[in-house]
Amino acid sequence: MKMFDNIKNVGKLIRLERIFDKKSEKTVIIPMDHGVSSGPLEGIKDMRIATNAVADGGANAVLGHKGLVRHGHRGYGRDIGLIVHMSAGTSISPDPNKKVIVTTVEDALRMGADAVSLHVNVGAETDFEMYRDLGLISETCEYWGMPLIAMMYPRGPKIKDERDPEVVAHAARLGAELGADIIKTNYTGDIDSFKDVVKGCPAPIVIAGGPKTNTDEEFLQMVKDAMHAGSAGVASGRNVFQHKDVRGITSAICKIVHEDVEVKEALNEIKI
């Protein structure tokens, strides 16, 4: 895949091909790590049902903690990539922005992971600890041939707008500089400003799905705009697993990301 021409580690390349579409060279990832931060949310109370639905809808990978591997493995049907999330923190913690490492790259390998991910809140009071974790774990990932996804979110006392193009660009570049192969970050809200974010980051960027949107059309238009701005894909959780038609919305996203269809056409995938 052309976007990974700079990666010479054959193990990473083989695993990246499992979570990216080989034809479009894009990806649709469904994060399901919310149970740790927010508890048993509607839509992921049964992770196997959620995993089955997004796999049937065409998603390239699911992302979650260790429990997703044990309780969400489908064991049949269409294969789907597995990304093990290594960071944890809760909404009821005294410092919700602090993320700690709760597993190892080696453990993720034993679980059959195709990639690992870390969460970094850029601007948090403990951000320096998360930077250190990212930098050191990137070295372990390189050793084992494990792709590393860095969730780089501008969050903290000095961050007035988490979608401000300047801070999003800084967060994305920071993740790439510290060794991440793929960056997940906020969409800035318009094509031109996000083009600048993509241009300033040497690693491919996938956009976060963000808060649950009011309409399917609004959400899918954001996906369409992000792809036109140069995004390498989408990593959306609540807008997918809390949808009335999980399979349908997943399929609609995949149509836009992989086939570049218009939003109106993609909406036809949603049956409920």
UniProtKB/Swiss-Prot annotation:
Keyword Cell wall biogenesis/degradation: no
InterPro entries: ADH_synthase, Aldolase_TIM, DeoC/FbaB/LacD_aldolase, DeoC/FbaB_aldolase, FbaB-like
Keywords (A to Z) from UniProt: Amino-acid biosynthesis, Aromatic amino acid biosynthesis, Schiff base, Transferase
MF GO annotations: fructose-bisphosphate aldolase activity; hydro-lyase activity; transketolase or transaldolase activity
Uppermost EC category: transferase
BP GO annotations: amino acid biosynthetic process; aromatic amino acid family biosynthetic process
Record-annotated active site: 33 (proton acceptor), 153 (proton donor), 184 (schiff-base intermediate with substrate)
Annotated CDD domains: DhnA
Residues the record lists as binding 1-deoxy-D-threo-hexo-2,5-diulose 6-phosphate: 33-37, 153-155, 209-210, 237-238
One Pfam family recorded for the sequence: DeoC
Cystine pairings recorded for this chain: none
Keyword Transferase among UniProt keywords: yes
UniProt-listed Enzyme Commission number(s): 2.2.1.10
Catalytic reaction list: 1-deoxy-D-threo-hexo-2,5-diulose 6-phosphate + L-aspartate 4-semialdehyde = 2,3-dioxopropyl phosphate + 2-amino-2,3,7-trideoxy-D-lyxo-hept-6-ulosonate
Subunit structure: Homodecamer.
HAMAP family: ADH_synthase
The family this protein is said to belong to: Belongs to the DeoC/FbaB aldolase family. ADHS subfamily.
PANTHER family: 3-HYDROXY-5-PHOSPHONOOXYPENTANE-2,4-DIONE THIOLASE, FRUCTOSE-BISPHOSPHATE ALDOLASE CLASS 1
Function, as annotated: Catalyzes a transaldol reaction between 6-deoxy-5-ketofructose 1-phosphate (DKFP) and L-aspartate semialdehyde (ASA) with an elimination of hydroxypyruvaldehyde phosphate to yield 2-amino-3,7-dideoxy-D-threo-hept-6-ulosonate (ADH). Plays a key role in an alternative pathway of the biosynthesis of 3-dehydroquinate (DHQ), which is involved in the canonical pathway for the biosynthesis of aromatic amino acids.
Name of this chain's protein: 2-amino-3,7-dideoxy-D-threo-hept-6-ulosonate synthase
Organism of origin: Methanococcus vannielii (strain ATCC 35089 / DSM 1224 / JCM 13029 / OCM 148 / SB)
